[in-house]
Regions:
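Peripheral interaction segments used for macromolecular assembly
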Residues: 1-112
Length: 112
């Protein structure tokens, strides 16, 4: 296992992360990473997860997540918690109000 990290320093989709499977805290597949949201310092803060056809994409915090040797991102949240998170907008832009709602939903706080 390795710590979740991305060295691109960019904002938006990262070829190093997009397309990787996301597993919940019981190693059940939640979906696939379609985009990554970075903070101003270039640190990844949120993964946009596509759960599959006919389902809405969701933001998932990367804090506490890790990459397996086989390349899956394991998050410390259950599939149901992700399922009930607010939908990610189509443009994947995360405004401050939505981020607060997401932090409450996942019970995380990011330092600014």
């Amino acid at each position: 296992m390795s710590t979740f990290r991305d060295d691109t320093g960019s904002h938006g989709a990262s070829s190093n992360l997009t397309g990787h499977a996301v597993l919940d805290d019981h190693h059940m597949k939640v979906g696939t990473i379609s985009d990554v949201v970075y903070d101003d310092a270039g640190t990844p803060r949120w993964a946009v997860v596509n759960p599959g056809p006919l389902r809405s994409e969701k933001f998932v915090p990367v804090e506490g997540a890790y990459m397996t040797e086989s390349g899956e991102l394991v998050i410390p949240y259950g599939k149901e918690q992700v399922k009930h998170a607010p939908k990610a907008p189509r443009d994947h832009i995360l405004d401050s109000r939505t981020e607060i709602v997401l932090e409450d939903h996942y019970e995380v706080r990011h330092s600014n």
